[in-house]
Structure formats: C-alpha cells, structure tokens
A protein has these predicted regions:
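Residue-level recognition of single "structural anchor" positions
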Residues: 1-364
Length: 364
C-alpha cells in the first residue's frame, strides 16, 4: 500500500478504489494480524485466494478484517463502509436519506451505518483540565408551538389538568416544557468538549459522576444552580460561580461559562433534521468528535474515525433495544379525589409542584 494512503490527503475516489487496503492497515497495527478471539499472533493463516480472510491455528476460528469491528456481520461491502465514513466526516451533518443516495443503498442500511458510527465515537477517552465551563441545556420543541388538542392531551397525561378539562394555566405549560425536553450536560475547557444526554430530571449525582470521569484537575465555572451544591467536597475541584439571575456573566476571578453556552448554540444550529430523544447520545457523540477534531483536515479526520470502528461491535437489535434515558421516574399513585381537592385549594400551582406523584392510573 502506498504511503500516501496512510499519511497524505485522500479523495473519495481513492477511498473507494483502495478501500480494502485502507481498512486492512487501520485494522491491524503495523500489519500484524492477531486473532480477535484468542489473541494468537504466530499461527495465523491467510486464505489462498489472497483475500483478507484468515484462520487461527490455535483456536481454529475463521475471521476477516471486519471481525470484532463496527463492520462485523454487515452485508454492506468494505467499499461502501469506507465511502460512507468518508462522506459522513468530511461533510456537514448528513442524514440517512442523503447518505443512502450517495452510497446507492437502502435508507435503512444507511441509518444503521450512521447509528453504528455514532455509537463508536464514545467520549470515554476525553480528559479536560484548566478552566472548565459547565452548564446544562434542554433539547426539544416548545409546547407553545404544539397543536391545541395535543397540548391538552399532554397536560392530561402528566396530570396538570383533570380529565375532560379544556382549560389550562400558562404556569402548567411552563412546568411541562422542561419535563418533555431532553437535558444535556456539557463541559468545555477551551480545547475539548464533552456532552452527555442525562436522565430527566437532571440530578446532581449524575453531573458529579461525569465530572469525576473527565476532569483531571482545574477550576469549574458554572451558574448558581443547586446542582453544584457541595461541589468541592464531592469532586475535589474549585467552583467559580456566575449568578445569571443577577446579570452576572463573569465571576470575581474573571471566569465565565460562556464557552459551553456557545457550544450549545453551535449544536442547536448545526443539528437540523429528524431526530429522536432515544438516540440523542449518538448525535452528541458525533458533534463532540467533530468539535474535538476541528483542527484536522478531512483525511486525518477520516483516519481518526476509522480508529473508533476497531474493537467495538453493535447490532441493529442492540441499538433498538437500548433504554431511553429520556424517560422520567415512575410516579406514585394518587386518587382522583385527592387531585380534585388539591385543585380546589391550590388551583394549578400546587399540582405543578407535586406533579411527580401522579400516575395515569389515577384517572382510570
């Protein structure tokens, strides 16, 4: 294989014509084939036809370059995969329908390819340090833009109004808005970012767990949220606070959380299309990878993306069965009489404060 494919610039034509060699060199370090099942190095026999198919002399297992990678078990050719990876990471955000047209494949195959690639871009290896800005954002449409009948249905399902009631208070809309959206917690140290879709409602314990995983040392910069109470005791990091309610956007030490807020703004503007909250972490993985490799050219980013396909396997069943972190915790039962009395005494506000106690069974 020519050195240009390893270090130089690549074009779509080059990627397609030499796809097998490109993936082979990315798959095996220094060209040394290792059995993915038992780790044998010496007794590896290649197929006589010269293809990239092998047999291990130790465990008698047959394998190829796609074994134990994101391409494992895929019916698509290596050429289609290499072109797909190149198209995804050398262009702006691309949808499965656009990718299907470029690769001349079914949209379902293109969707699965995108899902696998995004799954492979895990954020576990990113370590941040220095001055780290952190904040939360909420992704999703505003309830005020929903059709009137849909608003009523959602308000009834979440027990902000009684069954068959057709009037609602604006405070109920405001409270339900945050509940229907997907929370995202982010970190930005000025060089790299980390974004995680969190359970709704967002919890302080989850945030501190993410911070301990990704921040080695430094100073955290955040707003006045209660999520950051007992910060230094539980994370070991200094916390600099900006009180946004008092129009304070820079702390006394001169630190600001604007970098992560800018990141959220880029994400909301850049990710346009049909998305589902169940797979939102996959979209965040792609955005984080693009941001953290923004200084690379297209060819280097393509090679970096190839590294994330190695040693990871996932099937369509795994993707569809993954649990949605968007789901809220189950609420305790409350009788219809109790809800009526609460509405009579506290109108809507008290119901909003206690909405986590209600379940749909209360109205049956």
């Amino acid at each position: 294989m020519k050195a240009g494919f390893l270090n130089g610039k690549l074009s779509t034509k080059q990627v397609i014509l030499d796809a097998k060699n490109i993936f082979h060199n990315a798959r095996w370090f220094n060209g040394i084939v290792v059995c993915p099942y038992c780790g044998e190095v010496h007794k590896i026999y290649q197929a006589k036809d010269g293809s990239y198919s092998y047999k291990c002399g130790k465990c008698n297992t047959k394998f190829n370059d796609k074994t134990k990678t994101l391409l494992h078990g895929s019916k698509l050719s290596i050429e289609s995969w290499m072109q797909g990876i190149y198209e995804v990471f050398t262009d702006n955000f691309i949808t499965s329908t656009q990718l299907a047209i470029k690769l001349h494949i079914n949209q379902k195959y293109a969707w699965l390819m995108l899902a696998k690639l995004r799954f492979g871009l895990l954020q576990d290896d990113y370590l941040l340090s220095g001055i780290i800005a952190q904040d939360e954002m909420y992704i999703g449409g505003s309830l005020s833009n929903f059709h009137y009948e849909r608003k009523l249905r959602l308000l009834r399902e979440n027990h902000y109004i009684l069954p068959n009631e057709r009037k609602y208070d604006k405070s109920a809309i405001f409270a339900l808005n945050s509940k229907l959206k997907q929370p995202v917690f982010g970190l930005n140290d000025g060089n790299k970012i980390v974004l995680y879709a969190t359970p709704n409602p967002i919890k302080s314990s989850y945030i501190k767990k993410v911070v301990k995983k990704h921040i080695t040392e430094g100073i955290s910069v955040a707003d006045e949220s209660k999520l950051y109470n007992d910060w230094k005791q539980e994370t070991g990091l200094e916390l600099s606070t900006n009180n946004h309610h008092n129009n304070q956007y820079q702390s006394k030490d001169g630190y600001t959380s604007n970098p992560i807020e800018n990141t959220f703004s880029w994400y909301k503007r850049g990710f346009i299309g049909v998305t589902h909250c169940k797979y939102h972490q996959l979209y965040l993985n792609e955005f984080v990878f693009r941001y953290n490799t923004r200084d690379m050219n297209h060819s280097d980013r393509f090679r970096e993306a190839l590294k994330h396909t190695i040693g990871k396997t996932i099937t369509y069943k795994d993707i569809k069965q993954q649990k949605s972190i968007f789901k809220t915790t189950k609420r305790n039962e409350l009788s219809l009489e109790e809800i009526k009395s609460m509405l009579e005494t506290g109108i809507v506000s008290e119901v909003i404060q206690n909405h986590q106690k209600y379940t749909k069974e209360s109205f049956k």
